Amino acid sequence: MAGRTSTYAPNQVTIVINHAASGISHTLTGFSEDSIVSVERLVDTFTEYVGADDTHTRVFNANSGARATVSLAQTSESNDVLTFLHEFDREAMSADGMFEMLIKDNSGRSLYFSDEAYIAVIPQGGFSNQMNTRDWVISMTNTTFQHGGNQKVSPATADTLTALGVNLDARWL
């Protein structure tokens, strides 16, 4: 149904890290003004192969890894948590340094989850006459991707999603 107004609330995006080895659970706070987080797959799901005789094959890539870039203001206390998680991982040099990571838009249906994530790139430091951003690059293995909308779905879309095996929460119908 056209004409439905959607609502996206940036302050409803949550990023939660659970680190089993230390027992901590931390919700990241203090995001930058212009960006919160971006998530991208490491590789295409399928790669096209074309033979010399123009036969086409798609090759499935099972790699479900992703990279998330989390943008925090330099004043965010979450910078401290991520710094010391990174140090824990460097010293552990084992799976004990990895953590679960959930990125969720609570004003919509998008979510991204990995049960094995780790800090791949720590941000550059810098200071100026303005607020600086710290961009943390986090590698996520076994990533679940769910790109979802932020408005109620039409009956036709609900039927389509049901046919695809999706069970929508009643608030979206």
Curated annotation (Swiss-Prot):
This is Structural protein ORF10. It comes from the Viruses. Signal peptide: none annotated. Its main location: virion. One of its GO terms (cellular component) is virion component. It holds the Pfam family KPP10_Orf10. It is found in: Virion. Keywords: Virion.
